[in-house]
Amino acid sequence: MLNPIVRKFQYGQHTVTLETGMMARQATAAVMVSMDDTAVFVTVVGQKKAKPGQDFFPLTVNYQERTYAAGRIPGSFFRREGRPSEGETLIARLIDRPIRPLFPEGFVNEVQVIATVVSVNPQVNPDIVAMIGASAALSLSGIPFNGPIGAARVGYINDQYVLNPTQDELKESKLDLVVAGTEAAVLMVESEAELLSEDQMLGAVVFGHEQQQVVIQNINELVKEAGKPRWDWQPEPVNEALNARVAALAEARLSDAYRITDKQERYAQVDVIKSETIATLLAEDETLDENELGEILHAIEKNVVRSRVLAGEPRIDGREKDMIRGLDVRTGVLPRTHGSALFTRGETQALVTATLGTARDAQVLDELMGERTDTFLFHYNFPPYSVGETGMVGSPKRREIGHGRLAKRGVLAVMPDMDKFPYTVRVVSEITESNGSSSMASVCGASLALMDAGVPIKAAVAGIAMGLVKEGDNYVVLSDILGDEDHLGDMDFKVAGSRDGISALQMDIKIEGITKEIMQVALNQAKGARLHILGVMEQAINAPRGDISEFAPRIHTIKINPDKIKDVIGKGGSVIRALTEETGTTIEIEDDGTVKIAATDGEKAKHAIRRIEEITAEIEVGRVYTGKVTRIVDFGAFVAIGGGKEGLVHISQIADKRVEKVTDYLQMGQEVPVKVLEVDRQGRIRLSIKEATEQSQPAAAPEAPAAEQGE
């Protein structure tokens, strides 16, 4: 009854298995894809009929990780998986972006792709497996889909490209790039890099696209064996007469409207033209569909903007193809934040802050691939007022998570190492105005805010969004695209980096036929734009401030003998708790004996360092210390000699004559000179007041080991 159809093939160093026909047979299509023990089960369901009045393509991609895949039980209160994590949201977007442009124009039937991770090998990331699964399931389903696509991860290790590197190999790699595309063309790139050149990045894209052809070939073979019949779907016939009538009424007016450079004015005028045109046409014929008229008008708008760009005319806002909008760069705009910047590029503006915290502020991420700690956090907020609209304000949406991740990738390569700058850093970008490429404005703002906060970043970084308009062999690459150019163009191409190289590259391509040469032109044009923006940013701040903000915690680092860690922590943490309360600092101790003391006041930090040095100091036999009587017993007295250490002065060692009663000589809290006679194997200390008084120069406290101290 169950008749699985299986295909196996070698993909780089991994074996990939595609299996269908075993599970979820009521779904339109279902595929289990595995790559060396990482397995993702992907299903596709498509509705045979579109909803009446549907005017957009309702594609939903859900990606969900099950903890049983890693042999674990969820740590949440209810012990089951909840809402998607940030990582799951990002992978859902990664699957969505290359498949969305491959559905035919006019197809508005609901389609849902669900990818469930059911087994995971910690060395093989499930994202590529899920992308291959989505491509295979859609190709098998019979739904109109111009795929399949392939997907590949590319690393760069020892000046060589590596196909689908393992998690361990990625740690050594200067590049983490995911590329997806069809047999003929690249459709999507998502990457972060350690400042690689334009040629190295382009080489990685081309390498990944060439290598993924084996995936496409095997999916095609699987479709021949197990594919369902293609749906008999036809696009609605074009109403040429209606198109001509709409164009006669609106084309010239829309062409004029798209010469208005101010976004709000232009939008208002376009809305007036559209509503007047629709009203005129409905007055002529009540049976016309308003949605259809809207689509025709949108197509005219698109054609107006594109034909003008291709003819070499100025763009919507009057700029030439490679011009950047006017820049305004300010730092230190908020008085109490640790670092802040306001970055404005035309009608796009980001208010960006940087906040410094201690290691305790780091985010612990319990992921399927294992637990990790993130000491650099980047959050991007896109409130509705940034585009002059009203709307819901609340938890971040998919787009905000995706843009925040892209901006983080742009800055990550220049962040200092934790051993040089032991702070957790959180950057928040508030988009206050938006008209094109707010994620790249966030990269620029983050670089400025980090410098303003005194974070010793390795270089300033800037980002730029590029666009493309292509008809046949004629194409134009646009620098610093507006929102309208993004919607009406054929490619969205974002590049972030420093003067030395690229730190992040994201590409979303809506058409086939983007050649290596076009990508080369776009990358080189983006480099010129990036260097221009960096030049303007450097006029505002050209290096990180020499010191961190007075409102930020200062972290001082000292080294102690690892054997002494237990003395500083104390029983059940009693000593370290008392220390933090007494000194008003935060103290963290690592297994190698590194102690980090965080304080907003330098004096408090010095006090904490002094106390830790006292606690960890070695007691010297034969040395005289000043101690304080802490307990009196019949046979002598216990004396504290600093650093939490206590020794016994036997009754015979109190004076050089017979002592009948200890209290005749000593009182609680009395300071006395004591000489260390012996420290036994259990660390018990024998002291003598009698011998100490014979020596005239007592030491104030135990001598501490030399501290390795830095800020």
Swiss-Prot record:
Swiss-Prot/TrEMBL cofactor(s): Mg(2+)
EC annotation from Swiss-Prot or TrEMBL: 2.7.7.8
Residue ranges annotated for the S1 motif domain, each copy included: 622-690
GO CC terms of this entry: cytosol
Annotated Low complexity bias: 694-711
Entry binding sites for Mg(2+): D486, D492
Known function: Involved in mRNA degradation. Catalyzes the phosphorolysis of single-stranded polyribonucleotides processively in the 3'- to 5'-direction.
Gene3D superfamilies in UniProt: GHMP Kinase, N-terminal domain, K Homology domain, type 1, Nucleic acid-binding proteins
Principal location: cytoplasm
GO biological process terms held by the UniProt record: mRNA catabolic process; RNA processing
UniProt-listed InterPro entries: ExoRNase_PH_dom1, ExoRNase_PH_dom2, ExoRNase_PH_dom2_sf, KH_dom, KH_dom_type_1, KH_dom_type_1_sf, NA-bd_OB-fold, PNPase
Family the UniProt entry places it in: Belongs to the polyribonucleotide nucleotidyltransferase family.
Reaction(s) catalysed by this chain's protein: RNA(n+1) + phosphate = RNA(n) + a ribonucleoside 5'-diphosphate
Entry keyword set: Cytoplasm, Magnesium, Metal-binding, Nucleotidyltransferase, RNA-binding, Transferase
Domain KH: 553-612
Region of interest called Disordered, as start-end residue ranges on this chain: 689-711
GO molecular function: 3'-5'-RNA exonuclease activity; magnesium ion binding; polyribonucleotide nucleotidyltransferase activity; RNA binding
Name the record gives this protein: Polyribonucleotide nucleotidyltransferase
Quaternary state and interactors: Component of the RNA degradosome, which is a multiprotein complex involved in RNA processing and mRNA degradation.
Family annotation (Pfam families): KH_1, PNPase, RNase_PH, RNase_PH_C, S1
Subcellular location: Cytoplasm
